[in-house]
């Protein structure tokens, strides 16, 4: 059985707060979820036990997959896919209601799917290069990497 894990962003990219006098960039928290009906939801952690208000639109579920660097892949992550040395392009991980599976799309909320996660193959074929909240510039309509 795969791990049920969610993540959410407590602050927007570029938004800073001070913790113990030190400015801190936007961050992510990981854990369980209490979904909200408005702009905010709550992610709770187990060790230590705590809760965090996060932006609802940044919440993503762990897909059960890890990339070639051993990083957990979440909804909203941007992956670069290379199979047997052939560049397949870049896509954002999103849930596909029609097929009831996670898929890679060329850009958020598009109908242009690169590949279903079930067909993605081995972890060495894909690498997380960012996420659609902090790194939207990495996505393009054609699925190639934007510099």
Summary of predicted features, one role per range:
Residues 1-147:
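Secondary-structure transition motif
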């Amino acid at each position: 059985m795969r791990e049920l894990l969610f993540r959410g962003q407590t602050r927007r990219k570029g938004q800073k707060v001070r913790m113990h006098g030190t400015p801190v960039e936007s961050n992510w928290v990981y854990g369980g979820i209490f979904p909200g009906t408005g702009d905010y939801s709550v992610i709770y952690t187990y060790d230590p036990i705590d809760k965090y208000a996060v932006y609802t639109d940044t919440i993503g579920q762990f897909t059960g997959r890890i990339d070639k660097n051993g990083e957990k892949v979440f909804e909203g992550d941007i992956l670069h896919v290379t199979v047997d040395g052939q560049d397949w392009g870049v896509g954002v991980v999103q849930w596909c209601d029609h097929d009831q599976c996670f898929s890679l799309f060329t850009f958020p909320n598009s109908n242009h799917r690169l590949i279903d996660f079930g067909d993605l193959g081995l972890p060495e074929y894909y690498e997380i290069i960012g996420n659609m909240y902090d790194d939207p510039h990495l996505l393009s309509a054609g699925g190639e990497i934007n510099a």
